[in-house]
């Protein structure tokens, strides 16, 4: 199959740094760590930018907003509240990794916060939802609409390009290579985008968000059959509310990599965080999370059926 790597605005494919190529062999699912030359934005000469746990089944779970690390020279220019990275998809790795291990699925997650660079946005900065307010590739505002940086200390275009090189490209290189590997081994692959957000974000949507928000790029990123099976799985329970292709239809990753005709299907799940954590303190709630995790597990199994 053709390369899954996303083209940048230059028309070229992103080139990854050393260390991003997955090391895999028959029966080998050892963890892979991605590194990049950190330059002025790193805490040492080479920094870890993501981790990939290769699996043995045709399912890759991508958690692009799980990271919360902000390099010191970026954090020192931010307002104190922004340094906490409050718009992180808190604890999604804690929800997904036990399920991935049980199923044999691959897991890809970053180290850095979405405030450093948003891995679920196109590298050219084009809007995902034209006409609606949203945060960008290297955002200068948070979900509350407040400025992230102190006056005059926002990143310039050179810094934006460096962040793309150091964080965005290696993640997408690894994602594309892992999908290629799964397709080569199994003839198909499902890319599952795991996300979460506060249940109420007035800047992005009105009222309270449904508990489970499934996005398939309005049906373009997966087959009708898979979308129907996933929707039936959600409809078979009554504990959690859900929406399909509602406010969240799938971000850049779902839209770019989901191409059913090539054997790659992509689905995004946006969870309302109040179902598994305290939205004010960011504390994980084991009791509430267990039911959420159980339903996610059923959805992931549906992808492999």
Predicted feature residues:
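Terminal low-complexity, poorly structured segments
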Residues: 1-4, 56
């Amino acid at each position: 199959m053709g390369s899954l790597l996303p083209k940048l605005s230059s028309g070229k494919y992103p080139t990854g740094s050393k260390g991003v190529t997955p090391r895999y062999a028959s029966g080998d699912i050892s963890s892979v760590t991605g590194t990049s030359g950190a330059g002025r934005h790193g805490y040492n000469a080479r920094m870890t930018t993501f981790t990939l746990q290769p699996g043995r089944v045709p399912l890759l779970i991508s958690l692009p907003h799980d990271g919360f690390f902000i390099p010191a020279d970026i954090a020192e220019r931010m307002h104190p509240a922004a340094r906490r990275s409050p718009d992180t998809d808190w604890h999604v790795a804690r929800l997904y990794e036990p399920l991935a291990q049980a199923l044999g699925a691959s897991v890809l997650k970053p180290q850095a916060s979405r405030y450093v660079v948003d891995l679920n946005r196109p590298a050219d900065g084009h809007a995902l939802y034209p006409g609606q307010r949203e945060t960008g590739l290297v955002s200068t505002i948070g979900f509350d609409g407040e400025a992230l940086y102190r006056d005059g200390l926002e990143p310039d275009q050179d810094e934006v390009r460096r962040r793309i090189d150091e964080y965005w490209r290696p993640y997408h290189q690894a994602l594309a290579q892992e999908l290629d590997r799964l397709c080569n081994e199994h003839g198909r692959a499902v890319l599952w985008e795991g996300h979460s957000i506060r249940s109420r974000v007035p800047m992005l949507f009105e009222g309270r968000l449904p508990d489970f928000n499934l996005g398939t790029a309005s049906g373009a990123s997966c087959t009708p059959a898979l979308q129907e099976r996933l929707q039936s799985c959600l409809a078979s329970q009554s504990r959690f509310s859900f929406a399909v292709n509602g406010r969240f239809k799938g971000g850049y990753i779902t839209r770019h990599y989901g191409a059913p005709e090539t054997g790659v299907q992509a689905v995004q799940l946006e969870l309302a965080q109040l179902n598994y954590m305290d939205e004010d303190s960011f504390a994980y709630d084991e009791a509430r999370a267990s039911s959420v995790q159980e339903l996610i597990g059923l959805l992931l199994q549906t992808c492999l059926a």
